[in-house]
């Protein structure tokens, strides 16, 4: 992320300079708040949208947009493949597409995150475009007690910090 600087968006205005090949080219990778605003800081309790914009320049190919998310310790937090049923195993016509993956609120841990975006065919495997760690953002926990942290203020390690649904049964003595 450019010597520690995080940027929430990268755009390739010149398609010849964009990651890709003769059939598909990335045009932009962005991170957005639920409101649609591009930002580099997120409240841990709120959803985060990862977005890739791409041009299909040659019709008839099947593509899967992919995001790889890394934390500040360069640990791979997750890999997400687009499973939108409308495009699953469907050859795409030429045109511009925008695919968005939503990370639920109360799921990531605090800290800096970087995002790689890829465009691939799964079967048979073929990598069409790869934009490694081009965007990034920071996740912050306000410590107000309504996140997974609750009222605990000590160090909380881990690559995710989900606020899980808990149920407790009580049996009186």
Where are these regions (language model features)?
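Localized sequence-composition bias
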Residues: 1-173
